[in-house]
């Protein structure tokens, strides 16, 4: 059927990709034809045929730009689907740092001219890898010229779908919204060419209507980061599997499981306070693993330690956003000390392409690492100090940066008018496992509103203790870490034996001036100075690369030893080193002349026993649930 063309004096560009791989070696069949005014009034098909020239070219951005520059308003693109434009033309411009012509943003879809039999015939041809011959482009060009203006409908997958698809694949910050807003962190596209300039939208969330065909969107997104990507453009199922799924790939902080049905599940390694509590509650030997691959699984870890048997619990440590800590990757547990020693012999063996460092660890270190990685609320309250109805209720505040000489009265003066909203016996000083002040305190307020007002009212205010003037950081907190602190403390602190209490009963009473003065805001007693064969050192300026093994090796001499085992902890970091601030640690030196079994572990056990005896005989009496031992803290 010969018909007068509705587009006289227009240069038209027909683009068809010769294969479905869309790689850098892709060749294009470019058919150019020019329709003159005389041809428009001529119904002879032969004359239209002779005005069509077909040739193979390896298209370049300069050629396309020249084509559009010569015909800025009358250039029309006919394409066999949107894929040649999405996967060839636009990446071609971006990779060569050229602007994308605005004419590319609209095109005419002429797939139906290639496949008269419908979608089923196209599927069959794609499965058989049948390509359309170049000679067919001449017939397609003639068919385009014979198309009426009514049938030249712009494809529904025009500007929006083209830019969205390319932006998603090439990694710009544009995301799809179906029924809810989606966090950018839920996805991890591969490193992009700079295609973000196409949409130029500053917002991280962009509402987008799904397009047909092809349509693409997020079907569902639960809180665990699972999403289903679907496309109803069945003729391009191979391209969909290659390109749509490629935008979700394993990166440095997540593991993606790609399934055949298009569902993609992201499983970041996260840790909560409940998991940490459950982990340290087991009576097992803990080993720390450092340097794990970013996509390491528990199966690989168990295979690494074979034939040794691990417990069922493996604790992976990451930050709340899924990024690895860069310092400690996982904790594992062995049932016996012998298995742990055999497992440590695998130090610096490899998993995949990375060598793994192994260190013996403790429950206290697990708690410190979890706290340092902000995986639980950084506001531990004194364990079992008061009855807590809701651990997640943020009715506490945490004070950090206190002078070591600070007392409860200093804290009360620091709070000022906010001290009226402190619960009875609600100020709790925090001590490390050597019984020394850690520079932190936790305060229970009467309500969440009071805690929020206190945190915002006195945050970064200065506290003066003697000649020292330090600013104090104040954060709103909850009691969620309460049980974890108490559990770790119970494992590290030796319980007072009945015979020890009987011995203490014959001790002379302390001097009146040395007795603990209990105020309305009592706090665990400060460690007294007791004679013994232990010497404690405070080490400042610890570099980021220095750990517990290096400190133990550096301070071990023929006359002194530093023991850091599962039973005895004599190296304790009070501040972990970072890139911005050096670390601090407290180290306990022992004389080799004193046997280990008779040596004084620390003044901590004596403090607990004396405090319990004094509390029992105190005339005023205290609530039975008030802790009378220092809190274990980093």
UniProtKB/Swiss-Prot annotation:
CDD domains attached to this UniProt entry: RRM2_ESRPs_Fusilli (cd12508)
Pfam families: RRM_1
Subcellular location: Nucleus
Cellular component per GO, a single term: ribonucleoprotein complex
Protein keywords: mRNA processing, mRNA splicing, Nucleus, Repeat, RNA-binding
Function, as annotated: mRNA splicing factor that regulates alternative splicing of many genes in embryo. Probably plays a role in the formation of embryo-specific isoforms.
Family under the similarity heading: Belongs to the ESRP family.
Protein name: RNA-binding protein sym-2
Gene source species: Caenorhabditis briggsae
């Amino acid at each position: 059927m010969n018909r007068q063309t509705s587009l006289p004096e227009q240069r038209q560009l027909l683009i068809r990709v010769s294969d479905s791989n869309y790689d850098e070696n892709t060749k294009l069949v470019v058919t150019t034809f020019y329709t003159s005014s005389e041809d428009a009034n001529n119904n002879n098909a032969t004359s239209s045929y002779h005005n069509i020239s077909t040739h193979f070219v390896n298209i370049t951005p300069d050629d396309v730009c020249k084509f559009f520059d010569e015909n800025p308003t009358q250039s029309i693109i006919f394409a066999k689907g949107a894929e040649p434009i999405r996967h060839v033309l636009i990446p071609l411009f971006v990779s060569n740092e050229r602007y994308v012509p605005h004419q590319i943003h609209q095109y005419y879809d002429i797939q139906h001219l290639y496949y008269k039999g419908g979608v089923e015939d196209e599927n069959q041809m794609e499965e058989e890898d049948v390509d359309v011959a170049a000679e067919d482009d001449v017939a397609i060009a003639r068919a385009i010229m014979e198309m009426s203006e009514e049938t030249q409908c712009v494809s529904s997958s025009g500007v929006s779908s083209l830019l969205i698809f390319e932006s998603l694949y090439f990694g710009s910050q544009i995301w799809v919204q179906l029924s809810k807003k989606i966090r950018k962190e839920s996805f991890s596209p591969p490193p992009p060419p700079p295609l973000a300039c196409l949409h130029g939208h500053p917002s991280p969330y962009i509402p987008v209507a799904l397009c047909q065909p092809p349509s693409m969107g997020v079907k569902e997104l639960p809180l665990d980061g699972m999403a289903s990507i679907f496309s109803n453009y069945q003729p391009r199922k191979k391209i969909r599997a290659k390109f749509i799924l490629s935008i979700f790939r394993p990166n440095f902080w997540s593991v993606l499981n790609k399934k055949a049905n298009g569902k993609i599940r992201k499983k970041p390694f996260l840790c909560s306070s409940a998991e940490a509590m459950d982990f340290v509650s087991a009576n097992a030997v803990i080993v720390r693993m450092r340097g794990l691959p970013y996509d390491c699984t528990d199966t690989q870890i168990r295979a690494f330690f074979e034939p040794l048997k691990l417990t069922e619990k493996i604790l992976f440590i990451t930050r709340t956003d899924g990024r690895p800590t860069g310092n400690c990757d996982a904790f594992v547990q062995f049932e016996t000390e012998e298995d742990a020693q055999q497992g440590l012999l695998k130090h610096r063996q490899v998993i995949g392409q990375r060598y793994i460092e192994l260190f013996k660890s403790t429950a206290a270190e697990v708690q410190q690492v979890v706290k340092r990685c902000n995986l639980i609320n950084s506001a531990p309250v004194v364990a079992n100090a008061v009855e807590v109805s809701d651990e997640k209720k943020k009715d506490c505040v945490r004070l950090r940066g206190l002078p070591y000489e600070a007392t409860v009265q200093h804290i009360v003066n620091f709070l000022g008018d906010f001290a009226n909203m402190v619960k009875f016996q609600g100020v709790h000083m925090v001590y490390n496992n050597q019984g020394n002040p850690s520079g932190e305190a936790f305060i229970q307020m009467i309500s969440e509103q009071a805690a929020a007002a206190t945190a915002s009212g006195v945050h970064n205010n200065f506290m003066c203790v003697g000649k020292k003037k330090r600013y104090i950081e104040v954060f709103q907190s909850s009691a969620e870490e309460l049980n974890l602190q108490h559990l770790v403390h119970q494992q590290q602190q030796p319980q007072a034996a009945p015979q020890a209490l009987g011995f203490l009963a014959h001790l002379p009473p302390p001097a009146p001036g040395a007795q603990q003065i209990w105020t309305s805001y009592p706090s665990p007693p400060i460690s007294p100075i007791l004679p013994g064969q232990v010497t404690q050192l405070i080490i400042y300026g610890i570099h980021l690369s220095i750990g517990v093994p290096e400190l133990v090796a550096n301070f071990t001499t023929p006359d002194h030893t530093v023991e850091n085992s599962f039973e005895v902890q004599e190296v304790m970091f009070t501040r972990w080193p970072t890139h911005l601030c050096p670390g601090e640690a407290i180290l306990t030196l022992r004389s080799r002349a004193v046997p280990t079994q008779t040596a004084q572990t620390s003044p901590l056990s004596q403090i607990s026993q004396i405090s319990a005896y004094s509390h029992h005989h105190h005339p005023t009496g205290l609530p039975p649930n008030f802790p009378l031992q220092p809190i274990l803290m980093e």
